[in-house]
Amino acid sequence: MRKLFLRVVVFFWVLLFSINAFLYLKQPGMVFYPLKEIESTPREWGLSYEAVHLKLNNKTKLSGWYLSHPQAKNTILFFHGNGGNISHRGDSIYIFHKLKFNVLIIDYAGYGKSEGVASEKSLYQSANVAWQYLINNKKTKAENIIIFGRSLGGAVAVDLASKVNAGGLILESTFSSVRDIVDIAFTKWSKLIYLRYDFDSVSKIKKVSSPVLVIHSPDDEVIPFQLGQYLFESITAEKTFLEIRGRHNEGFMQSISSYMPAIKAFSLSLP
């Protein structure tokens, strides 16, 4: 009986180790969905732009676009989600242009024309390089930069905002942490899963002093609405919550009548 019990215990731990090893190796493909092909550019959307070339760690080349607006006071530093690349963010770029913002959007390492490999560390580093480009190359004042992050880009935005004094922070359809997502998806078994990534926004958000606008939809089928609410509740700075309607990737367009005015009002409320 004792031998049987020991065999069951050993089998359980071997199985758990095997599952974790498999998931650990698979996690990059589950978190990052980069596409290399640039399918369109702002010029095809009727917007003039400047191709931006940055360097990560003085070696890895990053690619992005800078769009200026003659009446802009603020600049949107745009961090997109985990799929595609900057060429799939035309709707958002056009909206920000209509709202009279300058826009800098970059592709993380491994996305679009950017070199390297996507990782949690390289995403954070890419964000810092983009920030420094605005400050040093475009001579943009920190208080005139609004950091914007959608979905996974929200975690990138929070990390950067916790380290700099931006004018504002907009988080759309994002989450509190990867652990919280796994807890919801796997419930009681989640603590047995070893995670390769943290993206722990809920801890970092407490260090953000800039005003924050959080946008989320109860219809979001990718990032649970409750995680957006949890992140919002953890903010200690001045904050606003906008509830939109629609699915994860389409909600902002389906709620355009409330979405655009809310972003405009938020920007006007900044010092």
Predicted region positions:
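An N-terminal hydrophobic leader/cap segment in hydrolases
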Residues: 8, 12-55
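Membrane-embedded segments
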Residues: 57-134
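Short alpha-helix in the alpha/beta-hydrolase fold that links the catalytic acid
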Residues: 92, 201, 210, 224-233
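Alpha/beta-hydrolase fold nucleophile elbow
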Residues: 140-151
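Hydrolase active-site cap/lid region
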Residues: 154-210, 243, 251-253, 257
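Short beta-strand/loop motif that positions the catalytic acidic residue
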Residues: 208-209, 214-216, 220
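Acidic catalytic loop of the alpha/beta-hydrolase fold
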Residues: 219-223, 249-250
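Catalytic histidine neighborhood in serine/cysteine hydrolases
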Residues: 232-251
